[in-house]
């Protein structure tokens, strides 16, 4: 059967299932696809298809992630589900699967477990803006008081990590019961089965509670410089991929990073050897810049809307350190370690001044496979912002991946 083409006339949102191992994330993901497939708005995916998540590489790290897509009447969704806990950590820190919101799956029979907390913390640290809770396996629990207790505990937990615990929607249901109903009759519609209805209820909550993200083109202009050359008689051209926003001829832009910030005017925009009036997010473009010499600008600088991004040398980061098997270090490192930090298009040397274990407790050294918070000082200022991803490299190979959690100076 030919796959129907998804129409792009609905807003697009990226979400994912998070939560403790065996609480039912993958089963719920399968139930959502099968439920919405009955409306012709998804390709039904079985548990095994999702569970056998393919490997992909992000920033030099291998991660297993399953991607499914579906739509509700309101929106088009891309949904990620990871088989293993380590895959979540890597996925969220590398930003391989950017999430605009998450469905936190919690088994009512267990309540919040260690990875439930860890995933909420991770979501907070890497900037997942909103969470909707699916209280799963309620078919195995007919104690209303106990369910209310679990909900209360979850709301308090979410609040303690700065999410809006009081107002987050918590939907009760059973991914397995919904999946069985849909498997038994793939044409089951809303109103036919109480468990399937819970899936619709969950998707209504996701539709209404998780805000539509601002599109990249609507954000302030930013392009990381990849290459620079001069065109005789015309001036200096900086090339790169426009990360966000738009740029038009005669726009004023700032050149940020490595040296003092300078202002220049865009006098020409080229793409594939053709001139354009405007470049936008996703374009690989060359920008002709007024009054700059080739030596004034270098790879690793960014061109940005004035005032939208500033250069910094010191930041705190949330980091995953690769294991030896993943191509990382074989030995631990200590405070004072000086690797390269690869940000956008360039490596900058920096010193890891201090670090703590992820829960804030002291750590003497960092072992391959650890997740830590670190304080970094770079030798040159570069354009940095909260939520930005970076890789840590040594001799050209990636030994860690991180996200900026706070700018220090």
From Swiss-Prot:
A Pfam family per the record: GTP_EFTU_D3
GO cellular component, one term: cytosol
Binding site for Mg(2+): 26
Region annotation (G1) ranges: 19-26
Region (G3): 81-84
Renumbered residue ranges of the record's region G4: 136-139
Compartment(s) of residence: Cytoplasm
Family annotation (NCBIfam families): EF-Tu, PRK00049.1, PRK12735.1, PRK12736.1, small_GTP
Biological role stated in the UniProt entry: GTP hydrolase that promotes the GTP-dependent binding of aminoacyl-tRNA to the A-site of ribosomes during protein biosynthesis.
Subunit structure, as described in the record: Monomer.
Family, per entry: Belongs to the TRAFAC class translation factor GTPase superfamily. Classic translation factor GTPase family. EF-Tu/EF-1A subfamily.
Name of the featured protein: Elongation factor Tu
């Amino acid at each position: 059967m030919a796959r129907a083409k998804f129409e792009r006339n609905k807003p697009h949102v990226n979400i994912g299932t998070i939560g403790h191992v065996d609480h039912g994330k993958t089963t719920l993901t399968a139930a959502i696809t099968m439920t919405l497939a009955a409306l012709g708005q998804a390709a039904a995916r079985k548990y095994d298809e999702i569970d056998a998540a393919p490997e992909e590489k992000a920033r030099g790290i291998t991660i297993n992630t399953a991607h499914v897509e579906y739509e509700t009447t309101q929106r088009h969704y891309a949904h990620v589900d990871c088989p293993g806990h380590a895959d979540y950590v890597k996925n969220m820190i590398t930003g391989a699967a950017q999430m605009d919101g998450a469905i936190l799956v919690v088994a009512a029979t267990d309540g919040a477990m260690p990875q439930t907390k860890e995933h909420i913390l991770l979501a907070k640290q890497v900037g997942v803006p909103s969470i909707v809770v699916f209280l799963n396996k309620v078919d195995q629990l007919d104690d209303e008081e106990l369910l209310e207790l679990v909900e209360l505990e979850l709301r308090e937990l979410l609040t303690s990590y700065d999410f809006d615990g009081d107002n987050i929607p918590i939907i009760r249901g059973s991914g397995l019961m919904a999946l069985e109903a849909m498997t038994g009759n793939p044409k089951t519609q809303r109103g036919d089965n109480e468990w399937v209805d819970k899936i619709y209820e969950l998707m209504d909550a996701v539709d209404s509670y998780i805000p539509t993200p601002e599109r990249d083109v609507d954000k302030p202009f930013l392009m990381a410089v990849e290459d620079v050359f001069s065109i005789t008689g015309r001036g200096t051209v900086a090339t790169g991929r426009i990360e966000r926003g738009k740029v038009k001829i005669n726009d004023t832009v700032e050149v940020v990073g490595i040296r003092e910030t300078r202002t220049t005017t865009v006098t020409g925009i080229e793409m594939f050897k053709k001139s354009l009036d405007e470049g936008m997010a996703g374009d690989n473009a060359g920008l002709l810049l007024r009054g700059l010499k080739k030596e004034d600008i270098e790879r690793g600088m960014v061109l940005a809307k004035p005032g939208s991004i500033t250069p910094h040398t010191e930041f705190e980061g949330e980091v995953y350190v690769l294991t030896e098997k993943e191509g990382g270090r074989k030995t631990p490192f200590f405070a004072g370690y000086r690797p390269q930090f690869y940000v956008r298009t360039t490596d900058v040397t920096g010193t890891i001044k201090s670090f703590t274990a992820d829960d804030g407790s002291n750590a003497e050294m960092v072992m391959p496979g650890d997740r830590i918070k670190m304080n970094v000082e770079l030798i040159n200022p570069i354009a940095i912002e909260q939520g930005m991803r970076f890789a840590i490299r040594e001799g050209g190979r990636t030994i860690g991946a991180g996200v900026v959690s706070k700018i220090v100076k």
